[in-house]
C-alpha cells in the first residue's frame, strides 16, 4: 500500500468500485494544466470540440496523446498513479490502456450523461480502473 492512500480507501474501491483520493496528485497540477492547455491548442487526430446550442463554452475530448505531449508522459511514468492503481486493485503491476482528456469550459450547455466507461474499453480483465483527475 502506498502512503498516499489508506486501507479504508482501498476497501471502498474494492467494495464500491470507486473511491475519492484528495490531493494525491497535488504536485502534478501545474504540469497537467500546461499539458492540457497545450492539448486544447493542439488537438490530436482524435480530438473533438463540441459547442452547445446556446454557443457557450466548448466541450473538448481527446485521447492517446501521451507520446506527443511531454507533461502527460511525465505524469504517467513519474507520478504515483501506477502505484496508486496497483494498491487499489491489489495488483502486482498495472498497464496503461490510454489517457483521455475531457475539458468542459465554463458556460457550456453540452451535457454529459451518466455512463459507465468499461464498454468503451477493448479490454478483458478482472481488474481495471480509471483515474479521474479534475
Where are these regions (language model features)?
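Non-heme Fe(II)-dependent double-stranded beta-helix
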Residues: 1-114, 119-122
Amino acid at each position: 500500500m502506498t502512503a498516499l492512500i489508506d486501507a479504508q480507501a482501498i476497501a471502498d474501491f474494492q467494495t464500491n468500485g470507486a473511491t475519492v483520493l484528495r490531493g494525491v496528485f497535488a504536485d502534478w497540477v501545474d504540469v497537467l494544466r500546461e499539458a492540457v492547455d497545450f492539448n486544447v491548442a493542439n488537438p490530436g487526430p482524435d480530438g473533438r470540440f463540441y459547442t452547445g446550442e446556446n454557443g457557450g463554452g466548448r466541450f473538448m475530448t481527446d485521447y492517446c496523446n501521451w507520446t506527443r505531449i511531454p507533461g502527460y508522459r511525465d505524469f504517467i511514468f513519474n507520478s504515483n498513479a501506477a502505484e496508486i492503481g496497483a494498491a487499489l486493485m491489489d495488483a502486482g503491476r498495472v498497464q496503461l490502456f490510454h489517457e483521455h482528456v475531457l475539458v468542459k469550459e465554463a458556460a457550456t450547455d453540452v451535457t454529459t450523461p451518466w455512463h459507465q466507461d468499461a464498454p468503451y474499453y477493448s479490454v478483458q480483465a478482472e481488474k481495471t480502473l480509471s483515474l479521474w483527475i479534475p
